Curated annotation (Swiss-Prot):
Gene Ontology terms: biological process: translation
Protein name per UniProt: Large ribosomal subunit protein bL35
Region (Disordered): 1-22
Alphabetically ordered keywords of this record: Ribonucleoprotein, Ribosomal protein
One Gene Ontology cellular component annotation held by this UniProt entry: cytosolic large ribosomal subunit
Gene3D superfamilies noted in UniProt: 4.10.410.60
Keyword Ribonucleoprotein assigned: yes
Amino acid sequence: MPKIKTVRGAAKRFKKTGKGGFKHKHANLRHILTKKATKRKRHLRPKAMVSKGDLGLIIACLPYA
């Protein structure tokens, strides 16, 4: 049986947590920040958890995580 390939883009974007979930960085915080409210930017700063519906897709992309 051949090895399963890891999706490299997903490996760079998602990190596994201790309880088996995955965390990721929010979108919309790279450029064109002047028109975005300070509160919006502040809420985008912390890492977010992958939702339950998307978890299966991430697990399939990262078979060895």
